[in-house]
Amino acid sequence: MSSEHVEFTKDNIDLYLKEVAKEYRKQVGKGMPAELILIGGASVLVNYGFRNMTTDVDALIHAASGMKDAINRVGDRFGLPNGWLNADFKNTASYTPKLDEVSVYYKTYSNVLTVRTVAAEYLIAMKLHSGRQYKSDLSDVLGILAEHGKRGTPITMEQIQKAVTDLYGGWTSLSDMSQAFISNVMEDGRFEQLYAQIVQG
């Protein structure tokens, strides 16, 4: 089955993570706890309601070697593509070990697998740092800003600047394009309308 035909949603990510935890526990027992930190599209899915799916699950994986087998077995059982849950993100410019420190607790499965996520201004900082002008990266930034506004916990430019500095050492680590994009949308403030324009465009 090719990855084009697999869509990960909040519900099925939960199911697959539960199965991975069970499989991992079967292999290594209770004494070897593991941790996954969801990033990218998967982190958007579990923290926010504006996005329906992603095509793979990116994570930082802290676990015994049995985790790889557990992931592959669950993938085989559900007909998921190789690499459906992967740590390839570690090879990108957006990776920094500081993501561990800023991640927030999400859920524990089978008393052995703790799942954390990167959210709010830190997820925005990662999206901006990747510098990709992909529709989904730009719409994710706007969706996160819009949803925090609706929740009554708006994210400020100062918080975003601090997050970029915490993770990547300074504002100038962002491309000129990313700096201009976030400055313009924060000045504009109509996050929902801008989100709709990008998604429809």
Kindly give the residue locations of the regions a language model identified.
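Compositionally biased terminal segments of proteins
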Residues: 1-201
